Amino acid sequence: HLYIDRIDLCVFGNTQPFRVRMVNRINDNFDYFYIKNADASRVYGLELEDLLSPNRISYLVHQNTLIEEHIAGIPGEKFMRLHMSDPNLNPIRLAKEFVKFNERCFVRLLGDMHSSNFVVDVTPDFEETHYRIRAIDFDQQCYEAKKSIYLPQYFKENNALIQLGMDVITPESMRQYQREERALIATRVKSSHTELEDILQTMESDQLAPQSHVDQLKTELAKHYQTKDFLKCSSMGEILRKSLSLVSR
């Protein structure tokens, strides 16, 4: 009772995936799926998203082909362009979610989270509106050399959310939200210890990025966290293991 209604070539980004529209013949309900190249960083990124974020995600891999489910939400660029002036917007909740999203990306080293690579999931409640910012592209997991690439706060495309945070939350509140998110990540690390250990061991033996990227990132993180332990790392997998260990202290 399922059939493929349409296949689109998505020309945005650097991967140009196919978007497949699957329709239920019985009730005309439909879902989208994306067909992409199954590069290592993207697969690791999907696994870490499922284990370490508050979001669940499903995908299939066969040889060099990856099939991802569609992640529902308003594209970040569109949300900032059309919804920031909504009178029903809850600025504090939205700013808080951006701080927490920023922290999630940095701790698990997911890079390139500008407004084209995430969506905003808006959930109205009986009193307030809740927001969840979700990554939709994972090909920059543990690849980039610069620390700033793993922090969404440094992308000019995200300036509307960055400015909102500066306007409505204090530095003290921001640090509180960061601590909250790191505590949640620590809980997820413990609850998925076996699966995460398998992934980290595989990543440590895999070459995810040029050695120059590894050397620059471990140096910048050693300075950021004020610990020389990062300097002992020889791969992106080892850097990620060290980053995750810091939230569990």
Predicted regions and their residues:
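AlphaC helix of the protein kinase catalytic domain
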Residues: K78-S85
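C-terminal catalytic region of ATP-dependent kinase domains
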Residues: E127-R249
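Short C-terminal domain-edge/linker segments immediately following a structured domain
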Residues: D50-S53, N64-E69, K100-F101, Q163-E172
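Noncatalytic linker/hinge segments flanking ATPase motor cores
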Residues: Y59-H62, G76-K78, N102-G111, Q141, ...
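Short secondary-structure transition/capping segments
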Residues: V43, L52, R104-H114, L161-L164, ...
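Conserved ATP-binding subdomain of kinase catalytic cores across diverse folds
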Residues: H1-K78
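Short, surface-exposed, polar/charged, turn-prone segments marking secondary-structure boundaries
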Residues: V61-N64, D86-P87, A95-F98, L161-G165
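Conserved kinase catalytic-core segment
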Residues: D86-K147
